[in-house]
């Protein structure tokens, strides 16, 4: 396990072995071969945390979109082809969600070779940026900050669209499903036999 910290003085560190705990003071010092000051290492750490937070925001949005898509598909199975209004509303909602999802991640890349045919999206760019920023024990370059700002803007635009969908489209869809009196449970009839 690797833990990344900047040089500092901590209060204590605790180790537990076979039920017995040991506590000792700990001071984290920089590699003496480095000429980088602690302020530069702190800048690096701070940018890496910001990148991590944007990747987390992206991933959480994708998880919510995919979960909602599964729920829409479940409702579609319950209503069958008879209820065109619910089916069409679900398709419309899914189309909006897909636009956001495809802006944040590359949904068509399945194998490692697929990135040759389908360009990577914001999430992959953020992950690559974290590799660049962490590749040297120094403050991030101005270009790293600029790329982060550009990518963050793209993530924030998409998450704002997502929040708007959650605030308006999802309640409208739920109201339509309620109005159409879609059954919560439906017994599937056997396909044959007696």
Model-derived segments and spans:
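Glycine-centered tight-turn motifs at strand-turn-strand junctions
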Residues: 1-7
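Short, aromatic- and glycine-rich surface loops/edge beta-strands on solvent-exposed regions
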Residues: 7-17
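Short acidic/polar inter-strand loop motif in beta-rich domains
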Residues: 16-24
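Low-complexity, Pro/Ser/Thr- and charge-rich linker/hinge segments at domain boundaries
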Residues: 23-57
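Mature extracytoplasmic or organellar-lumen-exposed domains after removal of signal/transit peptides
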Residues: 24-26, 30, 57-194
């Amino acid at each position: 396990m690797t833990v990344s910290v900047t040089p500092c003085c901590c209060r204590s560190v605790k180790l537990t072995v076979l039920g017995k705990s040991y506590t000792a003071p700990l001071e984290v010092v920089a590699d003496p071969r480095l000429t980088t000051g602690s302020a530069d290492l702190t800048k690096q750490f701070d940018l890496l945390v910001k990148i991590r937070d944007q990747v987390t925001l992206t991933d959480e949005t994708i998880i919510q979109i995919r979960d909602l898509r599964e729920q829409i598909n479940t409702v579609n199975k319950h209503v069958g082809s008879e209820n065109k209004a619910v089916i069409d509303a679900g398709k419309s909602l899914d189309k909006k969600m897909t636009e956001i999802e495809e802006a944040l991640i590359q949904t068509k890349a399945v194998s490692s070779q697929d990135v040759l045919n389908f360009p990577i999206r914001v999430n992959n760019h953020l992950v690559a940026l974290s590799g660049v920023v962490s590749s040297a024990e120094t403050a991030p370059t101005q270009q790293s900050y600029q790329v982060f700002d550009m990518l963050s803007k793209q993530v924030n635009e998409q998450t704002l669209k997502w929040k708007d969908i959650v605030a308006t489209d999802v309640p409208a869809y739920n109201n339509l499903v309620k109005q159409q009196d879609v059954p919560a449970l439906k017994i599937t009839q056997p396909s044959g036999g007696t």
